[in-house]
Amino acid sequence: GLGDVYRRQTLPPVLQTALDNELAFLQQLCSLTLDALLDAAEVPAEELAFLPRWETADLDLPAAYAQRMSEVGKKGYGMFAKHHVFTVENGKLVPVKYPDPQRLSELPGYEKEREKVIANTRALLAGMPANNVLLYGDAGTGKSSSVKAIANEFAPEGLRLVEVKKNQLYQIPDLMDKLAANPLKFILFI
């Protein structure tokens, strides 16, 4: 699937050739001026004088694409590029448009315990073995706030948070299948 391509950052040769051709075509299109278009179309300029002039830019589209692909493991693609917190509705991932803005620097107490979770998260992001984590304690001790703050803190490094309700636990295997090929790293928060 598409996620595999993003994760591997390689394409089969036939698709790579098609991609190169499309990027070259789009590169030409980006540099096309209205005057060049009118000349090629052999249309008298006065007939299309109402068309606005547009500016072109010196953009190296293949290089921009390669740069974006090199960052996909941190920035994501599609909805994962725009959002970093998700919930599950009817078996589908849905972005949380206004996630809790909690920051680690705003959380008092439990630094020692929180540091263990942060170290585990760093291991996950580095592609090293990471553990499942169970946070427990009295209500109001910052368990949920810590998870949300970690998600906010590490979103620029490719971390995404998926909030799963208790009555949705049966959907976790399907979620894992959907997320497995994604180059980002995910915390499932129950």
Question: What spans do the regions from the language model cover?
Answer:
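Pre-Walker A adenine-sensing motif
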Residues: K112-A126
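Interdomain "pre-motor" coupling segment immediately N-terminal to P-loop NTPase/helicase cores
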Residues: L38-P95
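AAA+/P-loop NTPase substrate/partner-engagement loops
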Residues: N152-K185
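Walker A/P-loop
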Residues: N132-V162
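Dynamic helix-loop-helix/coil hinge segments at AAA+ ATPase domain boundaries and subdomain interfaces
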Residues: P95-E115
